[in-house]
Design a protein with these regions (language model features):
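Small/polar/charged residue-enriched interaction surfaces, especially the RNA/DNA-contacting tracks
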Residues: 1-508
């Protein structure tokens, strides 16, 4: 056996710096089941600041790059860009049937990741939000016993300094590595890469405003000295070199559908929440869900609430047709308790801020069904969200915010729902259109206390965009709007949307 040391011939190093800013609450759990909440935040043991591990960043970037190159739900192979940039996996699914001798030979050729990703500690001690979650029984519409949980979240605006370093060896494809790095950096800049848990329900959205990039050619003495003397823990000068002459030739293979729908509140809305974000500690017994955004705490509709409502209405539609719920499970994900089989949801629902609202306290009392009188000591107060009309004086004070917009439907808008479906099938689009219709006509309320008329919406405008990579990244756009109670939609869009619903009927 040879004792000769095998070294890598590194010819270039690329250092990338940026600041990651959270756009929505993010759950970076430490997995401690004995904490004050069911999911505690991962913190630095010395400074008590939030910790973002390098493995979490690498996993998110690797998954994004793989989906960009190969689309969703595709197995990874050692020839993919993700394997070249982030290193080989322990085993590949397409190599399971190979002989042991062949497997051993392939493993000897495995390479580690040329991209070094540092762990990151938040710039400040983070602001923390507490969220409650509960599982709902689809038959009764009530909460299941012993299925409530709570978790800690990093609030929006938390910042993490990022540092990557790409090592380019003489025998590696430099252009391919630079293209792969450019794709993930651009993905972070566009806010298309999420981190942490529950990303499919609106958590973990983030972005990087600007990247600083330094490229060192180690075959040159000056660059070699510059890399050795580079200040790694202080403030660096502005980058003097960019990823030059890098043209992203890789086609985006992701097949995805986006639905953006604007609604106004017809009735008050109440999504119950704890009171840790309410400034008035003498607040009512029940308050609406708030979340921190730039400028203060804002009322929001959580992605989990919207997804749960859509999920149960989709089950109702399919059951009405007396068919199997496989379509719903494939769309919203499932967990089989017996076989332990599970699948993640392909439907991504964003958390949205509720605009143009006011908060009023309403007193209620429980009634004795036997006597018809009030229960003693059963008086309670709730503080739902009410739609508020924008006053003319406010418009004059802030002309930029309320300036005339060609999209007149937005002046009464309270909620803008954003939904993304990965790898959509035509019949699944038809099901989503039926769900959108129920929301549009106030037939599908969201939130709690819907039995007393709360949570009903009225549609104002909807935009549907389908990026279909199966047809060369074809972009298909459809729109629906409302004007004085009349639905506005072109004949072409009407026929196309009706086609999707017909496909659903054929499928079930």
């Amino acid at each position: 056996m040879s004792r000769e040391r095998i070294s890598r011939n590194i010819v270039k190093r690329i250092i990338v710096d940026g600041v990651l800013v959270l756009d929505t609450p993010t759950c970076l759990s430490d997995g401690d089941a004995l904490g004050a909440t069911d999911m505690m935040l991962l913190r630095d043991s010395i400074s008590d600041k939030a910790l973002l591990t390098g493995s979490s960043i690498a996993g998110a970037l690797r998954n994004y790059l793989h989906e960009y190159e190969c689309s969703y739900e595709r197995i990874e192979t050692r020839s993919n860009m993700s394997a070249k940039l982030f290193g080989d996996l322990f085993a590949y699914k397409d190599e399971r049937n190979l002989s042991e001798q062949r497997k051993i030979k392939l493993r000897e050729e495995d390479t580690q990741s040329p991209l070094i990703i540092n762990e990151s500690i938040s710039s400040k001690v983070p602001r923390v939000e507490l969220r409650d979650g509960v599982k709902i029984d689809g038959k009764t519409g009530t909460a299941l016993d012993k299925n409530k949980y709570d978790l800690e979240l990093l609030s929006a605006g938390t910042q993490f300094p990022l540092r990557f370093e790409l090592l380019i060896e003489s025998d590696k494809d430099e252009v391919l590595l630079k293209q792969a790095l450019s794709i993930v950096l651009e993905g972070l800049k566009k806010g298309e890469i999420g981190i942490g848990m529950k990303k499919r329900r609106g958590f973990g959205k983030c972005h990087v405003e600007e990247w600083q990039i330094w490229e060192f050619d180690l075959t040159k003495k000056s660059d070699c000295i510059a890399w050795l003397t580079f200040e790694r823990w202080g403030t660096q000068p502005h980058s003097s070199k960019q990823l030059q002459n890098v043209k992203i030739e890789q086609i985006d293979r992701r097949n995805r559908l986006f639905i953006t729908a604007n609604f106004k509140l017809v009735t008050p809305l109440l999504i119950r929440s704890n009171q840790n974000l309410i400034p008035n500690k003498c607040s009512p017994d029940t308050v609406h869900l708030h979340s921190y955004r730039k400028g203060g705490n804002k009322p929001v509709v959580s992605g989990a609430s919207i997804a749960g409502v859509l999920w149960h209405r989709a089950e109702r539609i399919i059951k009405t047709l007396d068919k199997d719920l496989k379509i719903v499970n494939e769309l919203f994900g499932f967990v089989d308790e017996e076989t332990k089989e599970a699948k993640a949801s392909r439907l991504l629902v964003d958390e949205t801020i509720i605009e143009n609202t006011s908060e009023l306290v309403q007193s209620r009392i429980a009634i004795d069904r036997f006597t018809g009188g009030a229960y003693h000591g059963a008086l309670f107060q709730e503080q739902p969200i009410y739609p508020a009309q924008v006053k003319e004086d406010d418009k004059k004070k802030d002309k930029n915010k309320y300036k005339k917009n060609p999209d007149e439907s937005r002046k009464d808008m309270n909620i803008s729902l954003q939904i993304e479906l990965q790898n959509p099938k035509e019949y699944e689009i038809g099901l989503l259109l039926l769900l959108l219709k129920d929301l549009w006509v106030s037939d599908l309320p969201i939130g709690g206390t819907t039995s007393i008329g709360r949570g009903r919406l009225q549609g104002l405008e909807a935009r549907i965009v389908w990026y279909n990579s199966n047809y060369g990244s074809l972009e298909e756009k459809r729109s629906i709007s409302e004007n004085k109670g009349k639905l506005i939609i072109s004949d072409q869009d009407k026929q196309r949307l009706e086609y999707f619903v017909e496909k659903l009927v054929e499928q079930v």
